[in-house]
Amino acid sequence: MERIKELRDLMSQSRTREILTKTTVDHMAIIKKYTSGRQEKNPALRMKWMMAMKYPITADKRIMEMIPERNEQGQTLWSKTNDAGSDRVMVSPLAVTWWNRNGPTTSTVHYPKVYKTYFEKVERLKHGTFGPVHFRNQVKIRRRVDINPGHADLSAKXAQDVIMEVVFPNEVGARILTSESQLTITKEKREELQDCKIAPLMVAYMLERELVRKTRFLPVAGGTSSVYIEVLHLTQGTCWEQMYTPGGEVRNDDVDQSLIIAARNIVRRATVSADPLASLLEMCHSTQIGGVRMVDILRQNPTEEQAVDICKAAMGLRISSSFSFGGFTFKRTSGSSVKREEEVLTGNLQTLKIRVHEGYEEFTMVGRRATAILRKATRRLIQLIVSGKDEQSIAEAIIVAMVFSQEDCMIKAVRGDLNFVNRANQRLNPMHQLLRHFQKDAKVLFQNWGIEPIDNVMGMIGILPDMTPSTEVSLRGVRVSKMGVDEYSSTERVVVSIDRFLRVRDQQGNVLLSPEEVSETQGTEKLTITYSSSMMWEINGPESVLVNTYQWIIRNWETVKIQWSQDPTMLYNKMEFEPFQSLVPKAARGQYSGFVRTLFQQMRDVLGTFDTVQIIKLLPFAAAPPEQSRMQFSSLTVNVRGSGMRILVRGNSPVFNYNKATKRLTVLGKDAGALTEDPDEGTAGVESAVLRGFLILGKEDKRYGPALSINELSNLAKGEKANVLIGQGDVVLVMKRKRDSSILTDSQTATKRIRMAIN
């Protein structure tokens, strides 16, 4: 107070004021401080001081022709005095106002296109809903999040090439645009930005925002998709949160979400097939997400999720070195261990062979709803510090950590036999057996674990076997913390290998992922997922299997037809008929198959009984291993719509209906396609005898010249092919047989072959 009073007194004297305002600052140190270097030392002061002057701005001389000397209010806009030390004019801030109001205008058409990400953000915020603010402790954990909504997923390099191509097309430098997405984006942007007057550098910056995923490692409680991250500063503080619903979705979040759903479906389906790895690859390569090939998305998208990482590993891509157990991502932060097989006895005296980790190790465990720090020694949990959204989530984390610790009291807590199986009916490995057992019921585990008194440590409390908090005692080694555990921040990726059962290992042989780790959570994808593989037909239920099977036969009828007559066994073994088998009642599969195969054989043997519609209708039933029986059927049952429905062997039914007039097939009322031929063949006396010694190959093929008459055929050499005119002006392609021994069968097959070739 004294000092302030003294200063007041001093300022009241005019001499003081004069000294402070008029005299020069001539202390060398001060002058040096403020004048050395180009860097402004006190920008805020400088700005205030400059703006207090009449003409703080300098401009090019041309401005004098473009702006009047005075505005409508008669205020001077620029001074006739030149700027000292340069050839520029001194200009008033009022000139800027005049220019903004009366200056030349330019086309604004490109602004929304260039600043697309900003315009879209404004729309999202305009339509978003902000709810009430709640004050509570925020358990935030740092996660790697996407901070840039609405981007494509190009790598930095690939985006750079696109930007150069769009903004500086004439610049030198080798640019090769390879991927589908690069080419599409380049074409699109070139059209959008024709005659764009915005500074190229600005356009380049904006394009980068649109093309590249930018991630940051940020503390988050709640939603992690990019439309939530862009308002992170509005929705969560240290002790408060504000509810928010985004006013729009962005494609990159939808891609991430749909990719996870597609990957989970594919891994689940692959697990139950004969060769899981081959099936998984086949499905990844034939699936599209929002019209983009899934394999292209996998190459570019950094999403880390168990199923997605299994698909990446199968494609030979690198993945994160952390491993997954019980739905938690484990990352070893210190220590090391060697692995040794050991046999242990459960509480039910069942013998389990487990791979024991020998040695001291520390891990971080990160799940969707809980996180933890785990310190363990050989088959012993030393300490577990866990934090989570609620009791349930905390319990999940504790169970996983207890099982992972491999402690004896955990193994002894098993009641009953362990015989959990996966989707393919194979027994799970012992660690997952234990996990499933305690996830079902952990009461005995928690009861037998043991409790200990605890010290009062800030931010930590104990937890009792019934999962209620306590400040006195806690489960041995377990504490609950208010603070979350950060996700592993590194984006390092490692080379991994995958076996045919989809177990992913690092180069040291540690299992990082296996299908048991893939979540069973079902969700609805935001983007359309198109699975072209027959293995995924059943994902939409039995009806879809039925329709898809028949559609497939009709689409591929040309080749199916030839295989039906020449190599039926190969046709019956096609994987496209696999899903259909699940619709046929188990007890009847073999009998139906035997019956249909016999029927088909008769068609092949007896002239003129070839019936396209009937072959298509019954073909899927012939795929099961046949039982030899004398059974005859007039209808075959399939299980759809929750009950058995009948397919009539001769004639139409609601399940399989062929309309002769329109030549279209409907399956369960859904259109399954058109038959391009006339299936009503009846019998036709074909010149079978004449065609002995010739093999009918199929339809006319113009490359083999004009059609010969049957008499001209005798001139052909063995193995030579020709088109030949038969019967009612139909032309087929034939080849003269190389051996005479097979001539006998020709007259029988010729009839069928000709009929098929004509059709």
Curated annotation (Swiss-Prot):
Gene3D superfamilies: Polymerase Basic Protein 2, C-terminal domain (3.30.30.90). Pfam families: Flu_PB2_1st (PF20947), Flu_PB2_2nd (PF20948), Flu_PB2_3rd (PF20949), Flu_PB2_4th (PF20950), Flu_PB2_5th (PF00604), Flu_PB2_6th (PF20951), Flu_PB2_7th (PF20952). A motif (Nuclear localization signal) lies at residues 736-739. One of its GO terms (biological process) is viral RNA genome replication. GO terms for cellular component: host cell nucleus; virion component. Disulfide bonds: none annotated. The record marks 627 as: Avian adaptation. It is found in: Virion; Host nucleus. Belongs to the influenza viruses PB2 family. Plays an essential role in transcription initiation and cap-stealing mechanism, in which cellular capped pre-mRNAs are used to generate primers for viral transcription. Recognizes and binds the 7-methylguanosine-containing cap of the target pre-RNA which is subsequently cleaved after 10-13 nucleotides by the viral protein PA. Plays a role in the initiation of the viral genome replication and modulates the activity of the ribonucleoprotein (RNP) complex. Influenza RNA polymerase is composed of three subunits: PB1, PB2 and PA. Interacts (via N-terminus) with PB1 (via C-terminus). Interacts with nucleoprotein NP (via N-terminus). This is Polymerase basic protein 2.
